[in-house]
UniProtKB/Swiss-Prot annotation:
InterPro entries: Ribosomal_eL21, Ribosomal_eL21_arc, Ribosomal_eL21_CS, Ribosomal_eL21_sf, Translation_prot_SH3-like_sf. One of its GO terms (molecular function) is structural constituent of ribosome. The keyword Transmembrane helix does not apply. HAMAP family: Ribosomal_eL21. Gene3D superfamilies: Ribosomal protein L21. This is Large ribosomal subunit protein eL21.
Protein backbone atom coordinates (compact mmCIF):
# COMPACT_ATOMS: atom_id res chain seq x y z
CA UNK A 1 0.00 0.00 0.00
CA UNK A 2 1.04 3.59 -0.58
CA UNK A 3 2.12 5.49 2.49
CA UNK A 4 0.30 8.77 3.13
CA UNK A 5 2.35 11.96 3.15
CA UNK A 6 2.52 13.94 6.35
CA UNK A 7 3.19 17.41 4.99
CA UNK A 8 2.12 20.80 6.35
CA UNK A 9 -0.77 21.15 3.87
CA UNK A 10 -2.13 17.60 3.93
CA UNK A 11 -5.93 17.09 4.00
CA UNK A 12 -6.53 20.73 3.03
CA UNK A 13 -7.92 20.35 -0.49
CA UNK A 14 -11.06 22.38 0.27
CA UNK A 15 -9.73 24.38 3.20
CA UNK A 16 -6.82 25.95 1.31
CA UNK A 17 -8.50 26.58 -2.04
CA UNK A 18 -10.06 29.77 -3.37
CA UNK A 19 -13.28 30.20 -5.28
CA UNK A 20 -12.79 31.26 -8.94
CA UNK A 21 -13.83 34.88 -8.31
CA UNK A 22 -11.41 35.22 -5.40
CA UNK A 23 -8.37 33.98 -7.30
CA UNK A 24 -5.29 36.13 -7.68
CA UNK A 25 -3.33 38.33 -5.35
CA UNK A 26 -4.80 39.92 -2.22
CA UNK A 27 -5.37 43.70 -1.88
CA UNK A 28 -2.24 45.49 -0.64
CA UNK A 29 -4.19 47.02 2.27
CA UNK A 30 -4.57 43.54 3.74
CA UNK A 31 -0.78 43.20 4.02
CA UNK A 32 -0.40 46.65 5.60
CA UNK A 33 -3.12 46.14 8.21
CA UNK A 34 -2.11 46.74 11.83
CA UNK A 35 -3.62 45.21 14.94
CA UNK A 36 -3.33 46.42 18.52
CA UNK A 37 -2.49 44.20 21.47
CA UNK A 38 -5.63 42.79 23.08
CA UNK A 39 -7.62 43.00 19.84
CA UNK A 40 -9.67 39.97 18.80
CA UNK A 41 -8.91 38.54 15.36
CA UNK A 42 -10.18 35.65 13.23
CA UNK A 43 -7.60 33.40 11.59
CA UNK A 44 -8.67 33.03 7.94
CA UNK A 45 -5.84 31.54 5.89
CA UNK A 46 -5.16 33.08 2.48
CA UNK A 47 -3.74 30.19 0.42
CA UNK A 48 -2.05 32.55 -2.08
CA UNK A 49 0.32 33.78 0.67
CA UNK A 50 2.68 31.04 1.84
CA UNK A 51 4.82 33.14 4.19
CA UNK A 52 3.51 33.58 7.70
CA UNK A 53 0.81 30.97 7.18
CA UNK A 54 -0.45 29.39 10.41
CA UNK A 55 -1.12 25.65 10.55
CA UNK A 56 -4.40 24.78 8.80
CA UNK A 57 -5.69 23.38 12.11
CA UNK A 58 -6.21 26.97 13.27
CA UNK A 59 -8.20 28.11 10.20
CA UNK A 60 -11.45 29.66 11.40
CA UNK A 61 -10.32 30.11 15.01
CA UNK A 62 -10.58 33.37 16.94
CA UNK A 63 -7.80 34.65 19.17
CA UNK A 64 -6.30 37.67 20.88
CA UNK A 65 -3.30 39.58 19.52
CA UNK A 66 -0.52 39.31 22.12
CA UNK A 67 2.33 41.02 20.31
CA UNK A 68 4.29 41.50 17.13
CA UNK A 69 7.27 39.59 15.75
CA UNK A 70 8.76 41.30 12.73
CA UNK A 71 5.97 41.74 10.21
CA UNK A 72 3.89 38.99 11.83
CA UNK A 73 1.52 39.08 14.77
CA UNK A 74 1.44 36.67 17.70
CA UNK A 75 -2.11 35.46 18.35
CA UNK A 76 -3.15 33.55 21.47
CA UNK A 77 -5.62 30.79 20.56
CA UNK A 78 -7.23 28.12 22.69
CA UNK A 79 -6.60 24.60 21.37
CA UNK A 80 -8.31 21.98 23.48
CA UNK A 81 -7.43 22.76 27.10
CA UNK A 82 -4.31 24.77 26.29
CA UNK A 83 -3.56 28.23 24.97
CA UNK A 84 -1.16 28.34 22.04
CA UNK A 85 0.63 31.24 20.41
CA UNK A 86 0.25 31.38 16.63
CA UNK A 87 2.61 33.49 14.51
CA UNK A 88 0.76 34.76 11.43
CA UNK A 89 1.08 37.48 8.82
CA UNK A 90 -1.74 40.07 8.65
CA UNK A 91 -2.95 38.54 5.35
CA UNK A 92 -4.22 35.58 7.37
CA UNK A 93 -5.95 37.68 10.06
CA UNK A 94 -9.28 39.54 10.02
CA UNK A 95 -10.54 41.84 12.76
CA UNK A 96 -13.32 40.23 14.80
CA UNK A 97 -16.47 42.30 15.20
CA UNK A 98 -18.87 42.01 18.14
Amino acid sequence: MVQMSEGFRRKTRKKLSKHPRERGLYPITRALREFKEGEYVHIVIDPSVHKGMPHPRFHGRTGIVVGKQGRAFIVKVRDGGKYKQIIAYPQHLRPATA
